Amino acid sequence: MLTDEYRYKILNVLQQDPNISQRELAKRLGVSLGKTNFCLRSLIEKGLIKAENFKNNSNKVKYLYLLTPKGIEEKISLTQCFLKRKLKEHEELEKEIERLRKEVSDTK
């Protein structure tokens, strides 16, 4: 299953580096090549990315992964969700830090 986290990470990497290989993408994500292939196929089926063939310098056929307009909208939506979640985590962490500081100062 393709989680929001992986969907976000993949869309983000592909937007920055559309000619990345599946092997390099798998390495950046810290997942297997098979899982990366599965995720890319899923994103293509959902219309979030498209893959185009091109030849690189050594005459090997490679893919160029491009975000579709729908993919760009999805990335924006996911970014907003992650930002909201991270801000909440940040607030909770600040509260915990303050509680720990108070605990330490109370024991002195």
Regions from the PLM with identified roles:
Residues E73-K108:
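Amphipathic alpha-helical dimerization/coiled-coil segments
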Residues Y8-N12:
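Pre-recognition alpha-helix immediately N-terminal to the DNA-recognition helix
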Residues M1-Y6, S21, E52-K75:
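Short, cationic-aromatic polyanion-contact patches
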Residues R23, G34, F38:
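Key DNA-contact positions within bacterial/archaeal DNA-binding proteins
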Residues K27, E45:
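Alpha-helical residues within the helix-turn-helix
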Residues L14-D17:
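Short helix-capping/hinge SLiMs at alpha-helix to coil transitions
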